[in-house]
Amino acid sequence: MSFNLHNRNLLSLIHHNARELRYLLDLARDLKRAKYSGTEQPRLLRKNIALIFEKTSTRTRCAFEVAAYDQGANVTYIDPASSQIGHKESMRDTARVLGRMYDAIEYRGFSQEIVEELAHHAGVPVFNGLTDEYHPTQMLADVMTMREHSDKPLHDIRYAYLGDARNNMGNSLLLIGAKLGMDVRIGAPKSLWPAADFIAQCEAFAAESGARLTLTEDPYEAVKGVDFIHTDVWVSMGEPVEAWDERINALLPYQVNRKLIESTGNPRTRFMHCLPSFHNCETKVGKQIAERYPHLQDGIEVTDEVFESPRCIAFEQAENRMHTIKAVLVSTLGGI
C-alpha cells in the first residue's frame, strides 16, 4: 500500500496509519544522524511556516524553530499578545489570511476544534503542537526515544502512563501504542481515564495492530514488567490552588518514586516525562505546592530521586522533539 505525506495535516495521529508513523520515525532517525554527522541537506529552502502559540512553550517552539532553520525554512512566531487572533479576528479568518502567506501553520493552544477549524480553512498543512485533547508531535518523539533505549521491536515494547489520563498525554500515548501494536498500560483512578468512546476507538486500532491495551486503577499492576514509565504534571498554573487538593489526593498513589519503579522487576526500566516536571520545589508552581503539601517537597508526579537518576531519559526525549518535528516538516513540505 503506497502513501504520501506531502501536504498532509498532523492533527491527532488518528488519520495516520502504522506504516506512515514508522516512516516518520525512520526519517527522524536518519535526520538526527545527518545532523550529528554534519551531512544534513536542507530540503525546505524558501518555505515559510507560521507558529501560532495560544499557550506558552519552551520545547515545542524551540523544536519547530530549530528544525525549520536547519532545513532552510523561515518561521514567524505568533502569540495572542502580538496578533489579532481571538481579539479582532476569528481563527477562521486567521487561517484564510495565513494560508495565503505561509506554506504551513503550527498551532499550540486549547480545544482540538480550533486546530481542526484552522486546518479546514487554511488550505495549507496544519500541525498540532498541542491541544487539550492531543499531543501528536510529542508522541513521535516519545516512540523514537523508546526505540533508541530498547533493543526490542516496537511490538514487544511495554510502557505505562501514570497520572491524569484524560489529558492530551494519556489520550495520545494510548492512541499511538494502539496504532503501532505496542503493549500500553494506563494507571489512573477510573474517574481520570480517557473517555469511553476514545478507549473504544483505540481498542479497534489495537485489534488491527495486535496492540495490548490495559487500563487499571492499580499503579503497580500498570508498571509490572514495563520497559518505560511515562507521567505528566498533575496541576497547571492556570488552575486555582483550591482545585489542587482533590487532584493531588487522587493521584498520590501514582507518583513515580523509587518503590514504584523498582516494583517493575525490570532493572532496565526507564522514566519518561514530556516536561516541564515538578520534581522539586525550585519553580514557582513547585514551591507553591510544596508550601501547601510539605510531603511533596521532593517531587510531585515524580520524585527528584527518580528524575535525577540514570533511569530518567526525559532530556533525550526533549531533544527528539526537534528531530521528529523536522521529519514531519520534511515529509510534508520537502517533497520526499
Curated annotation (Swiss-Prot):
Q: Which SUPFAM superfamilies match?
A: Aspartate/ornithine carbamoyltransferase
Q: Name one GO cellular component term.
A: cytoplasm
Entry EC no(s): 2.1.3.3
Among the GO molecular function terms of this UniProt record, one is:
ornithine carbamoyltransferase activity
Task: List the InterPro entries hit by this protein, alphabetically.
Answer: Asp/Orn_carbamoyltranf_P-bd, Asp/Orn_carbamoylTrfase, Asp/Orn_carbamoylTrfase_sf, Asp_carbamoyltransf_Asp/Orn-bd, Orn/put_carbamltrans, OTCase_ArgI
- Residues bound to carbamoyl phosphate are S57, T58, R59, T60, Q84, R108, H135, P136, T137, Q138, C274, L275, R321
Record localization: Cytoplasm
Q: What is this protein called?
A: Ornithine carbamoyltransferase, catabolic
Name the species this protein comes from.
Answer: Burkholderia mallei (strain ATCC 23344)
List the taxonomic lineage. Answer: Bacteria, Pseudomonadati, Pseudomonadota, Betaproteobacteria, Burkholderiales
